[in-house]
Amino acid sequence: MNLHEYQAKQIFAQYGLPVSEGCACQSLEEAIQAVKKLGGGQWVAKCQVHAGGRGKAGGVKLVKSEEEVRSFFEKFLGQRLVTFQTDAKGQPVNAIYMEACANVKKELYLGAVLDRSSQRIVFMVSTEGGVNIEEVAEKTPHLLHKMPIDPLVGAMPYQGRELAFKLGLQGKQIQQFAQIFCQLGKMFVEKDLSLLEINPLVILDNDQLHCLDAKIVVDGNALYRQPELNAMRDPSQEDAREAAAEQWHLNYVALEGNIGCMVNGAGLAMGTMDIVKLHGGQPANFLDVGGGTTKERVAEAFKIILSDQSVKAILVNIFGGIVRCDLIAEGIVAAVNEVGVSVPVVVRLEGNNAPLGREILAQSGLNIIAATSLTDAAVQVVNAAEGK
């Protein structure tokens, strides 16, 4: 689960990390009051969306008067911001963070991620702050320094000092960086994070380190024990179909194709998407209904797929092991009757109670295309999506 920048900075402040004073504003009136409270002659206005690349998209701007604040709010508040990390629709801007301006001498990068291969939290630093860190890793990997954390002892000051040396920090900056590093390590564990990022971590004109940006991603599997963070969830930033699928314990990821896919098992779902693409089709989604599904969940899965207006055909690929094919068939029939499907539906059933499942579909009187194999299913659904 992603947090907004202003929410992440609230967490940073709880751990004593240096962040700028600011206010998340949901109206122009709140923004005018915020800049008066912050004081100074200039501020930074930041659109709050769950996506990077805000600056390049115009969603972060230095404003020097109340009139410029007004202009920024009229342009972005209530609109959708499109960045290189969003789809063509962009993300809704429901709040704009007004922040005190900082005098920056140098920009650095500091981040941490849960590395599943090494089963450790890994910190990363670079002297190339304020830019896309993926580009740094690809083009100049020698400028990206990593530090794995022993889970038994956590982030240690000596590790922070070692990274500080690699960043070229001097004097009191080294001690300050070590403190920031240790607090971030503590935060990562206590808050069940999967990623945190400060890009940029800056050196101010007074030579102090400062967290100019803040990004936090919380492990969704741990939200049950993080009520404070769970309360910060912003459903408006999530795909409505993915949110609906989560309520029914369905694994759904929206894509940009026109062939809806409903499969049981993540591996089979990925294989199904591959074979659809192999035959010239474009999947509209990844959807794994799971091994212990019910006909009600199948019906909801159908509704979620059909809520995507770009879907021109649907492929149902079920290998019955734990899940029975007759239950899937009953769910398909119920969903088609309830929703009223106007697009072709191709179904391939194999395994547990597959003959019974096929019989249920055949006797339903619905216009369902039966496939004899996975290859046949892929060919038929691609042709159906193309209107052949």
Swiss-Prot record:
GO terms, biological process: succinyl-CoA metabolic process; tricarboxylic acid cycle
Annotated ATP binding sites: 46, 53-55, 99, 102, 107
Cofactor(s) demanded: Mg(2+)
Pathway named in the protein's UniProt entry: Carbohydrate metabolism; tricarboxylic acid cycle; succinate from succinyl-CoA (ligase route): step 1/1
The keyword Phosphoprotein is assigned to this record: no
GO cellular component: cytosol; succinate-CoA ligase complex
The entry's keywords: ATP-binding, Ligase, Magnesium, Metal-binding, Nucleotide-binding, Tricarboxylic acid cycle
Annotated EC: 6.2.1.5
Catalytic activity: succinate + ATP + CoA = succinyl-CoA + ADP + phosphate; GTP + succinate + CoA = succinyl-CoA + GDP + phosphate
Residue ranges constituting the ATP-grasp domain according to the UniProt record: 9-244
InterPro entries: ATP-grasp_succ-CoA_synth-type, ATP_grasp_subdomain_1, Succ-CoA_synthase_bsu_CS, SUCC_ACL_C, Succ_CoA_ligase-like_bsu, Succinyl-CoA_synth-like
Residues involved in substrate binding: 264, 321-323
Keyword Magnesium: yes
SUPFAM superfamilies: Glutathione synthetase ATP-binding domain-like, Succinyl-CoA synthetase domains
Domain of life the protein comes from: Bacteria
Record: residues binding Mg(2+): 199, 213
Cofactor note text: Binds 1 Mg(2+) ion per subunit.
Family: Belongs to the succinate/malate CoA ligase beta subunit family.
Quaternary organization: Heterotetramer of two alpha and two beta subunits.
Job of this protein: Succinyl-CoA synthetase functions in the citric acid cycle (TCA), coupling the hydrolysis of succinyl-CoA to the synthesis of either ATP or GTP and thus represents the only step of substrate-level phosphorylation in the TCA. The beta subunit provides nucleotide specificity of the enzyme and binds the substrate succinate, while the binding sites for coenzyme A and phosphate are found in the alpha subunit.
HAMAP family, per database record: Succ_CoA_beta
Protein name, entry field: Succinate--CoA ligase [ADP-forming] subunit beta
Species for this entry: Mannheimia succiniciproducens (strain KCTC 0769BP / MBEL55E)
Gene name of this polypeptide: sucC
